Regions:
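Conserved RNA-binding domains used in RNP assembly and mRNA/RNA metabolism
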Residues: 1-90
């Protein structure tokens, strides 16, 4: 996916708030939160994204520690969507 499409999706209310289902071209699907770190704009311009995976979301919400996040290439994303339980609440 290109960075403009990804940014439009997450900056529409999901950045650092809601978990997003991220489907990859060659990896397993994950749930994660896109986080806004000091280097967010620089990474975004290169189509890289800092994401906290589902296993670390609760800890990240308490600490806001960006060391819990990993950087992923947006070029490997196939689709972004809200998980079913979040989509039902919206």
């Amino acid at each position: 996916m290109i960075n403009e499409v990804i940014a439009k999706f997450i900056e529409g209310g999901h950045l650092a708030k809601n978990a997003v289902k991220i489907e990859f071209k060659k990896r397993n699907t994950i749930l994660g939160i896109f986080v806004q770190s000091p280097d967010y704009e620089d990474l975004k311009s290169k189509n890289f994204w800092r994401i906290v995976s589902e296993t670390n979301i609760n800890e990240w919400k308490e600490s806001q520690d960006n060391k819990l996040a990993k950087i992923f290439s947006g070029a490997e994303f196939n689709r972004l969507s809200l998980p079913k339980q979040v989509a039902a609440q919206v």
